[in-house]
Amino acid sequence: MTSLLASEGGWQTFTLKGGEWAILGLSGAAAILALLVGWFLVIQVLKQEEGTDKMKEIAEAIQVGAWAYLKRQFRTIGMILIPVGAVVFFTSVAINKPEVDGGGEALSQIQSGLYRTIAFVLGCVASGLTGYIGMTLATRGNVRTAAAARRGSMKDALQVAFRTGGVAGMFTVGLGLLGATVIIALFQNTSSAMLVGFGFGGSLLALFLRVGGGIFTKAADVGADLVGKVEAGIPEDDPRNPATIADNVGDNVGDCAGMAADLFESYEVTLVASIILGVAAFNSVGLNPALGLVFPLAARAIGVIASIAGVFAVRAKEGETNALKPINRGFAVAGLLTVIGTFWLAFQYVGNPDKGAAGFGDKDVMMSWIGLRLFGAVVVGLILAQVLSRLTEYFTGTEYGPVKEIAESTETGPATVVLSGTASGLESSVYAILCIAVALGATLWMGGGDIQFSLYLVALCGMGMLATTGVIVSEDTFGPVSDNAAGIAEMAGELHGETGKILVSLDAVGNTTKAVTKGFAIGSAVIAAVALFASYIETIAGELGLKDAAGDPLEGSAIFLAAETQINVSDVKTFIGLLIGGSVAMMFSALAIRAVGRTAGVVVQEVRSQFKDGGIMAGTKQPDYGPVIDICTAASLRELTTPALLAVLTPVVVGFGIGYAALGAFLAGVILTGQLMANYLSNAGGAWDNAKKYIEDGHHGGKGSDAHKAAVIGDTVGDPFKDTAGPALNPLIKVMNLVALLILPAIIKYQDNDGVRFVISGISLAILVAAISFSRRKTESMVAA
């Protein structure tokens, strides 16, 4: 019998033979190739010209500020990770072999806990390293992009900016694939426990980087806009604004380090979910279960090769002025190669036997068309990624109706701007979740009625969404690099003539690519969470020791049909879990947005105090950039703890306090409201931002008009929506799912011991309440600190 503890790390029955070991070897080779290509791109970017002395001076100030922030952030995160690592260790369980594999203990509780804790730490390191590398290169590629534009070369500027992003992309896919490959090669039948630890580490660190970086960047941005644009009437990135360097630093620590880590954990969690579910899924349809384990690795390796080709395919043709066209060509190359490679893998490696099925959805003949089903699930993911991208582009692009409608509403003041942007964001969220629902329905249909195999296809759909992650990360990092390049040129007095045209064009395209990649991350978070939710149900069955009429452990679809594994919302306690889960995204968003608002208030006070005597505007005094950087750094690090505790402790409170069924409903609530809120916040913020840019292009009175001032207020409201709260909901959803998997065995073990349950949930609740109370303190306390 196949062990059912797939998600928690129970023994999985399979044997890696020559073909599977070859796939592991090729997967590792593809990962190493990605890292080598990343290093090659580093060398290529750094050898480019840096421009004038003034440009170098400004770039160095941004580098110093970004590195100082990241160093302090990693130190703070390190202290938080120590107790979390202890939780990972103590929630581990011994792993026993089933009788068919000889019985006995495969790993003791101490061994399992030690190995999983090490995997957790390595996941943290890999995610942090991805963010660090992405940010480090971005703070060096920005000035080189500006220098290339200064030479009048659109082609060179695009290549430098995109290949700077390509460094982060290659290290994201390389480290993610290498980590999973090494864990499977070392632990084999017990690897799923270590993969959960590795994925949890990556997700938790991504949450830290997303929240901390988002607070820093948007506090500086909001403060700079409110005083600079609205009150002083000076343009964005004007060197007279004391917050402008902090604003540019924030682009790197938030949009580069944060997003790179975010996409790393999305990439890793979808891979982990596919690997975890693969063994049981292939066993359920009578195929070699080892194929289900290595197929996701092979598919990821194909995606890595395709991403490398896609990054190098991004080249502007002579006379081409729209950078989005070559970027889309690169993405198309990567997508096409992924489709071709996955088709070959599914049909030639797994096979596609036809047992005479009456139709594609015929559940009675599950051996039919397996290869086609696997290929179809990956393609559905690729299509979903494109649909969500186009949907995001429609609701946030300056050439489409929603943004033009928001821009038109500026004629009647900031209130109507906020109302129209809110409506647009809410509407976009509905369409996004409907698209995801259709994709989930399609993959379930492809499963032919076998629930376990269908859920494996759902995980593969998530993998398909992020198959070209190397290019996706490159696109995202391209945004802040081009934004910084324009800022450096502005502060150095170089943003004019052909240089200005090139950099403004790249910046506009960068805003589009940033918005699009947020759609990728949000959609993949939901797909991955659904797959992990399936693992949660499997773990319940295994921990409860559910058996069929013959006395054998439940397998396949029977696991999901058993009464004990049902999440029944008609049960009041279960429904309470659903309600709490639905509220978490709201609380998390409130914490993040409040932190930005509070910190921005302090930034505004600092900038106003420097402008007060008129010396900066008169040119008799230089602005002091340091205090604003210090304010944003201190505040963002101070605000890290509460969102992290909310993500880790809320599942503990619900699981131990109410029960495992309530925790399952809690996860369902988190997935639903988290997805809706993430899309709403990201798209509303993006629409407000681009409505402002649309007006700055000369519409509705242009810069300096009343309409422009109203648009700036809308953009200011949207900043923490799209760059702090919205994106950080992605790792929040996955962290909570992974925490639930980690603690589920302990919840079931102590479900009849009220003393232990209430002590654990009570202490966790007390810590959580104290943290939330601390986060609600007034601004004055922060100023005093």
Predicted regions and their residues:
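Hydrophobic packing and interface segments
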Residues: 2-785
